[in-house]
Amino acid sequence: MKNLFSKVSILFSWVVLLMLAVILCPHGALANVKPAAGGMLFVGIGGMIVNASTLNNIFVNLKTTFNRCFDATPTTWNKIAMLVPSGTKTNDYKWLANFPRMKKWFGEKAVKALAAFNYTVTNDDFEATVEVDRNDIDDDELGIYAPQAEMAGYSAKQLPDEIVYDLANGVFTKTCFDGQYMVDVDHPVTDANGVVQSVSNKGTAKLVCTTQAGAIASLGASRTAMKKFTDDEGRPLNIKPNLLLVPPALEDIANVLMNNDRLDDGKANPYKGTMEVLCDARLTSDTAWFLLDTSKPIKPFIYQERKKPVFVQQIDPQAEDVFMRKKFKFGAEARAAGGYGFWQLIYGSDGSV
């Protein structure tokens, strides 16, 4: 009899609890909610019911927002850099030193051996992570996360830009495949007689549009120097500078040089329409400017991609972070790196003189 009374009491208690839950949960939503298979059920009184299905729907929406913003975000890195897919931790670029060119065939073929230069680029890990507090899901306060998902998508799409323009900022201080700085005064090049010469792709002139003479001494001299670059057999490389890369401080000057019929002194502008102007606010020097030849298969900069940016999430209700801190997570992950291509395809001036 006591056992029967005990069972009846327990059953009555469960009935009372169920009735209270139905009354307190709006619109009788609890009647249609079941725990996901193998999952936990959280009930947010007066708010959203948190279970595996709810979480999945929430993060599907966040992923959709992420992808929409990712696809809509413009980039410019591919104007000045080439994409190199990576299948390993590190890529070796010593082949840049000995790129073969067609020539007349006399006797045996001249086989280009790989040079002894050691130029490798190791992939780095990148991430952007957002925490979602379980209370915000309980309280149906998820609107604050849509802008964060958009920014995560924007940031992920901009990763190649960030890497490539950081490379541009480092051309005067970071080495390329020949062991010299990417923009330097003494790149070793063998001439037609087999003698090693020092070749410069670095200037100091300010970019100016005030006079024709000043424009010729800065922009014109740099263009001429690039066009005279030769390969390791003394043959002209046929460099054609077609892009003028500048920081915001030099954008107006660059546009005058590329668009105006006449310069500030009233004389004819010999450089109108000769190059595209590319301005990026991530260039940190207000005086440095660069000429690039981007018309060839190889570009001045390399974007090495091991893993494209992807949306990731951690939504297991039983994960330690959820149990201990009530935190779910979403964000983006990628593996990539950057490096320098042919130094002959860029001419840089620090604008110091």
Task: Name the predicted role of every residue range.
Residues G170-T190:
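Charge-rich, acidic-biased intrinsically disordered regions
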Residues Y119-C176, L244, K326, F330-A332:
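Long, contiguous amphipathic alpha-helices that act as assembly "spine/axial" helices in icosahedral shell
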Residues T88-D92, A116, T120, N135-A149, ...:
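Short, charged/polar micro-motifs that form catalytic or ligand-binding hotspots
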Residues C25, N32-A36, F42, I49, ...:
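Sequence/fold signature of self-assembling virion shell proteins
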Residues M1-N32:
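N-terminal secretory/membrane targeting signals
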Residues R68-D124:
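Assembly/oligomerization interface modules of large self-assembling protein complexes
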Residues K2-F5, L30-D71:
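N-terminal alpha-helical "arm" segments
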Residues L62-T65, L114, F229, I315:
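Short alpha-helical segments and helix-capping/turn motifs at coil-helix boundaries
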